[in-house]
Amino acid sequence: MSGLTHFDAAGHAHMVDVGGKQETQRIAVARGTIRMLPATFELIRDGKAKKGDVLGVARIAAIQGAKRTADLIPLCHPLALTRVAVDFELDDALPGVHCIAQVETFGRTGVEMEALTAVQVGLLTVYDMCKAVDRGMVIGDVSVTEKRGGKSGDWKAQA
């Protein structure tokens, strides 16, 4: 298990010690998609969902999700985030919605988990607010698309 940082030599899970790492600017971007029926897409696009502003509520939920990541992922370090930006892109061709989250901090560990959690919580909120009209929505294609900072350097997913 030498390549997995969250396990010790005996194979027991532990929280990684980041105390000796240098503090640097850390940035991560993640994205994901929720696919839905055309009628559901139209409700969101036209702002006519019964529960209100779907994407506005989902944006706040995504930000809250990023802030609460350490409460949800057992071995994730609690971080003082300096920025969480969440955007939604409507995609007529799917039909569906893409969620993109960029999370930043100045610290000793990356913010990939916070960006992924923001995207998932944002998309789950879209599902929650629209499930009365479309229980068949599908969340998928969630991934980190970019990370910057830290000892391992910068990384960007292949397009």
From Swiss-Prot:
Chain sites annotated for binding substrate: L75, C76, H77, M113, E114
GO biological process: Mo-molybdopterin cofactor biosynthetic process
EC number(s) stated in the UniProt entry for this protein: 4.6.1.17
Pathway(s) the chain acts in: Cofactor biosynthesis; molybdopterin biosynthesis
Active site: D128
InterPro entries linked: MoaC (IPR023045), MoaC_bact/euk (IPR047594), MoaC_sf (IPR036522), MoCo_biosynth_MoaA/MoaC (IPR050105), Mopterin_CF_biosynth-C_dom (IPR002820)
Entry superkingdom: Bacteria
Keywords: Lyase, Molybdenum cofactor biosynthesis
Family named by the database record: Belongs to the MoaC family.
UniProt cross-references to PANTHER family, sorted A to Z: CYCLIC PYRANOPTERIN MONOPHOSPHATE SYNTHASE (PTHR22960:SF29), MOLYBDOPTERIN COFACTOR SYNTHESIS PROTEIN A (PTHR22960)
Protein's recorded name: Cyclic pyranopterin monophosphate synthase
